[in-house]
């Protein structure tokens, strides 16, 4: 299983949100390029970078910074505000390894399909963020500010028909809380769609959580807040 460090960007700084809330932001003193270089030296094979300003505004704001981070030598999957073919092509042409498409996949499936066809499915990661109400994982959009009526399973089934294989799934209730991932959700995801390369994000506390996710068949795990709090030796995980 691939371990992917995450870097969230806001106004050019490394930050973390609690449960996706923009009114609960923790800023970190380390600069994004320094953070990317740190992960590169530890042996990370990939970074997950989110432009929170872009996610909120609907247009990526920090592409130049993200490209500078990728010059450290780590392939980057990046998202936050990619909501047009022009923006997707700009990111792809700038050298971003994989584009992370979130809200657009829910609000504008036709445009999302055009982007998939233009960029190629293997270069796309769908980021599907859910709130689990009455045991049904419903998708949130626009930087988690709004809820949709679409379920995770409906959307995955739809995009699977267009060649999508990489899906990043976050249970918002777990994100930034350090209380453990939603293992039931990921177990269902792998059982329902075993051919999808699932990436798990949110709530990972320690090595046992990663071991459990691996045993469920998850392809990759995104690590965020815990890496700033030294809860885990990342170098050991990456070896």
UniProtKB/Swiss-Prot annotation:
Protein keywords: Amino-acid biosynthesis, Cytoplasm, Histidine biosynthesis, Isomerase
Catalyzed reactions: 1-(5-phospho-beta-D-ribosyl)-5-[(5-phospho-beta-D-ribosylamino)methylideneamino]imidazole-4-carboxamide = 5-[(5-phospho-1-deoxy-D-ribulos-1-ylimino)methylamino]-1-(5-phospho-beta-D-ribosyl)imidazole-4-carboxamide
Entry's EC annotation: 5.3.1.16
Any one GO CC term of the record: cytoplasm
Pfam family, one: His_biosynth
HAMAP family: HisA
Name this polypeptide is given: 1-(5-phosphoribosyl)-5-[(5-phosphoribosylamino)methylideneamino] imidazole-4-carboxamide isomerase
Gene that specifies this protein: hisA
